[in-house]
């Protein structure tokens, strides 16, 4: 399963990319608004840092506006994936852009029907928002399983399932068990995935024991 980082924060992107963890980036207008500076500079820098796909979202809501904006966003790099909303105009823009070789990520997906229609329109990625479904008392992971089952029936659909609105590490585990193609994570969730109390305790014990060895063998070097 590929791991994308859901952020526009350059420091976080560089941090996790240096660990070799990132296969791509997803952004949206809300994430861009949290960062200082010119969003154009940030988008250009992100596409240079990350070799994998970088989803940049349109802010237009009509068909022609989304297509025009999508083409401009694509100019930031060959790894740019244009992100459009799951609306009638969004699907129309998806079909238009994908037919010109511009990959599209259809976002704000909350049902299997929407995912199927996005795939039919030519989307490279479909982004189901699981956390927001959990927030209203539904099980977001059931949606991922339903989409996975549907896509499995139709191998000609090459659309990848990009699990979004991830709230905690267990969402990642569940997505991986189902077989989702991609999960996009806030930096805080990826930080939590790196940590376990027993890892910390084990490392501390190893170092304490090694200090004893060094005390008994002051000339030892490794």
From Swiss-Prot:
Keywords (A to Z) from UniProt: Cytoplasm, Pentose shunt, Schiff base, Transferase
Signal peptide: none
Gene3D superfamilies: Aldolase class I
Enzyme kind, highest EC tier: transferase
Subcellular location: Cytoplasm
Top-level taxon: Archaea
Catalysed reactions, as listed in the record: D-sedoheptulose 7-phosphate + D-glyceraldehyde 3-phosphate = D-erythrose 4-phosphate + beta-D-fructose 6-phosphate
EC code(s) of this entry: 2.2.1.2
Entry GO MF terms: aldehyde-lyase activity; transaldolase activity
Active site (catalytic residues): 83
Pfam families to which the protein is assigned, alphabetical: TAL_FSA
GO cellular component: cytoplasm
Pathway where this protein functions: Carbohydrate degradation; pentose phosphate pathway; D-glyceraldehyde 3-phosphate and beta-D-fructose 6-phosphate from D-ribose 5-phosphate and D-xylulose 5-phosphate (non-oxidative stage): step 2/3
InterPro entries the record matches: Aldolase_TIM, TAL/FSA, Transaldolase_3B, Transaldolase_3B/F6P_aldolase, Transaldolase_AS, TSA/FSA_arc/bac
GO biological process, one term: pentose-phosphate shunt
Described function: Transaldolase is important for the balance of metabolites in the pentose-phosphate pathway.
Entry-linked NCBIfam families: fsa_talC_mipB (TIGR00875)
Membership in a protein family: Belongs to the transaldolase family. Type 3B subfamily.
Protein's recorded name: Probable transaldolase
Record organism: Nitrosopumilus maritimus (strain SCM1)
Chain's gene name: tal
């Amino acid at each position: 399963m590929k791991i994308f980082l859901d952020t526009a924060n350059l420091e976080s992107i560089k941090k996790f990319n240096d660990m070799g963890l990132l296969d791509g980036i997803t952004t949206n207008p809300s994430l861009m608004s949290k960062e200082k500076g010119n969003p154009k500079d940030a988008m250009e820098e992100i596409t240079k840092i990350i070799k994998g796909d970088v989803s940049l979202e349109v802010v237009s809501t009509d068909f022609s506006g989304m297509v025009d904006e999508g083409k401009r966003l694509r100019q930031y790099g060959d790894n740019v994936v244009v992100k459009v909303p799951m609306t009638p105009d969004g699907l129309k823009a998806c079909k238009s852009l994908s037919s010109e070789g511009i990959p599209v990520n259809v976002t704000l997906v909350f049902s299997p029907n929407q995912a199927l229609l996005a795939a039919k329109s030519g989307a490279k990625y479909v982004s189901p928002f699981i956390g927001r479904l959990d927030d209203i008392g539904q099980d977001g992971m059931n949606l991922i399983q339903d989409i996975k089952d549907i896509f499995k029936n139709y191998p000609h659909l090459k659309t990848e399932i990009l699990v979004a609105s991830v709230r905690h590490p267990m969402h990642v585990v569940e997505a991986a068990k189902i077989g989702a193609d991609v999960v996009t994570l806030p930096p805080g969730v990826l930080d939590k995935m790196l940590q376990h109390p027993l890892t910390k305790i084990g490392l501390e014990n190893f170092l304490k024991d090694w200090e004893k060895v060094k005390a008994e063998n002051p000339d030892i070097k490794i």
